[in-house]
């Protein structure tokens, strides 16, 4: 218990300070080289590696990443998920507009070019579609969690269909991804407060996760793309859960 307390005391303030440093680095790049995607992505990758080291995150990746930019769609368990999606190309996220004003994390996400979606705005789908086209044409991958919220699992919530139809209309490839933590309680769900939840889990020596990458999907039928991605991810998550429990 004492070691867990000490780790939490070091890790959480350390994470906030480190994140603030990287936000400043992103801001500097934006000011000096606004369109240098490689440098922005390099900062993100460097940040993720240091988050792993500081927070004791260990990731096992199964499967092969696509060679071309893709829309990566995964199940959603926790706030940790955002640093778990590997990519060969610079990536941006699709996220709820409510997260845009989060101190430090929201600011950094905006500097990386995150596509903010306002679900209450009727024009949101059109704006999102154009933003996705723009990012993919510029060689960026897109990361989205189509459940729309976190869920403890191991089952999946229904996927929100919007991005699948945008993908079908634009001919954008989709790569399904399955995430499963060794400890299911790391899922951030319900009315859990962030600080108590983070304090509990970042006090552990390690946080172990399996990430499985599926085959890239293309097609003109958004409903079929959704069905195929959801079915594969649901089966793969159950397989990963069995691996952890065996």
Model segments located where?
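A transmembrane-helix-recognition feature enriched in membrane-embedded lipid enzymes
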Residues: 1-60, 107-111
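A membrane-cytosol interface segment of integral membrane proteins
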Residues: 115-136, 141
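Short active-site segment of divalent metal-dependent hydrolases/proteases
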Residues: 150
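A cross-family acyltransferase "interaction/gating" segment
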Residues: 104-106, 154-224
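Residue-level preference for the first positions of well-ordered beta-strands
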Residues: 69-71, 139-145
